[in-house]
C-alpha cells in the first residue's frame, strides 16, 4: 500500500506528518507532496519521494496578488493530478496548510481516499475548504470534530 502525505506552510503542518511517516515506513510505501517551502526541507531528511507543486499561499488581506490565486490554484491542482495519475497512492493523508490543497483536491477528483487532520481547536482555512472532499476530518479535540459532518476526534500525532 502507498500513502501520500501532504501538508505545509509551517512546521506545525509537517512535524506531525513526520511522526506518522516514521511509524508507518516499514509497512507502507511513503511519499510526500508539497511546495518548495519548509516542508521540502523537513521531509528531505526522511528520504522518501517528494513531489513538488507550486501552490500559492492564501492571502487573507486585500492585495492585487489575490487576483492571481484562482488561476495558480488551478495550475497547482493540474500538476498534482498529473503526479497522482502517474503514481497513484492508495490514500492521501493531509495535515493541512495551503501546501496540501492541490493534493487533496486532485485525490478527490481521482477518487483516492483522503484523510485530513486538524490539530488546532479552531479549524484552519484549508481544512474548512477541503473537509467535504475527505472521508474523515480527524481532530485533536472533540469540540473541533463536532464542526464537521465527517469529524472524528483521534488526538494528535506526536513524536
Which positions does each model-derived feature cover?
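Active-site-proximal region of nucleotide-activated glycan assembly enzymes
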Residues: 2, 108-159
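Short amphipathic alpha-helix
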Residues: 13-24
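Structural motif
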Residues: 6, 33, 94-95, 117-118
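An aromatic- and histidine-rich active-site surface loop
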Residues: 37-41, 91-110
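Conserved nucleotide-sugar phosphate-binding/catalytic loop shared by glycosyltransferases and other
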Residues: 2-8, 27-72, 152-154
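Residue-level detector of alpha-helix initiation sites
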Residues: 10-11, 15, 97-99, 121-125
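An amphipathic, basic-hydrophobic alpha-helix
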Residues: 62-91, 109
Amino acid at each position: 500500500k502507498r500513502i501520500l502525505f501532504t501538508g505545509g506552510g509551517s512546521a506545525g503542518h509537517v512535524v506531525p506528518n513526520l511522526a506518522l511517516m516514521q511509524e508507518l515506513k516499514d509497512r507502507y510505501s511513503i511519499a510526500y507532496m508539497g511546495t518548495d517551502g519548509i516542508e521540502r526541507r523537513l521531509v528531505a531528511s526522511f528520504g522518501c519521494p517528494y513531489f513538488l507543486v507550486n501552490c500559492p499561499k492564501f492571502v487573507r488581506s486585500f492585495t492585487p496578488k489575490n487576483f492571481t490565486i484562482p488561476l495558480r490554484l488551478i495550475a497547482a491542482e493540474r500538476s498534482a493530478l498529473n503526479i497522482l495519475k502517474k503514481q497513484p497512492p492508495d490514500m492521501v493523508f493531509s495535515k493541512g496548510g495551503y501546501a496540501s490543497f492541490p493534493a487533496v483536491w486532485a485525490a478527490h477528483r481521482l477518487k483516492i481516499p483522503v484523510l485530513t487532520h486538524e490539530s488546532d481547536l479552531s479549524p484552519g482555512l484549508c481544512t474548512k475548504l477541503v473537509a467535504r472532499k475527505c472521508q474523515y476530518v480527524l481532530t485533536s479535540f472533540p469540540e473541533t470534530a463536532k464542526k464537521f459532518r465527517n469529524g472524528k476526534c483521534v488526538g494528535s500525532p506526536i513524536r
